[in-house]
């Protein structure tokens, strides 16, 4: 797939101001990079899993007239869908070069949408053969088999490990508030480790309602190995069942929490 991606970037970059992708650096490190025409595309790489949506957002804000491309996995594309709805990226100025993740990669992430949907974008292509949805995270079913008291004990045991490094917030493509409630002393006491249970993580979870696109970066970067995606998978499921909305799925679908109750009717059988 890497050869196909490089070849397509080499062709499309003639029409664009640059393409955001991962670059293999001379010291062996990998970092986001804005490839321009004439750059050495042999340095373009697809691994490791790295979120690029925030990089595109920053570049579009810095260069509002530029037309950029992005080499995007399904999770990147879903993140960009939600960011577009909240005016963090301009979909009209973005060319999406999607790549379909393998069944193995999808399984590692429990990914329900392992390839971008090109139909959602003004200009897009997908390289690779899309695979079926991966099985869901088994920890979710295990959690749902617990009693309420067991669930509380589960989260207490997990959140007590939190060192408040803000890694989950910093990596999240849907966290872009200029003033973060997680840094407000009114809600989160400074210098307290672990943060008060359950305020810190429930504030973030509340803000991610109808936003979380299951990229799982929050869990991957957590130095304490807190299974955050159990919480967010449950949020995504409830929003889907209650409001018929799946974050990151449809570019034109309005986020339910931005609508009135008349426009976003809660399913009566669940009320």
Regions found by a protein language model. Give the residues of each.
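Iron-sulfur-associated redox domains of electron-transfer enzymes in respiratory
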Residues: 1-161, 169-178
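Ferredoxin-type iron-sulfur electron-transfer modules in oxidoreductases and energy-metabolism complexes
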Residues: 139-159, 174-271
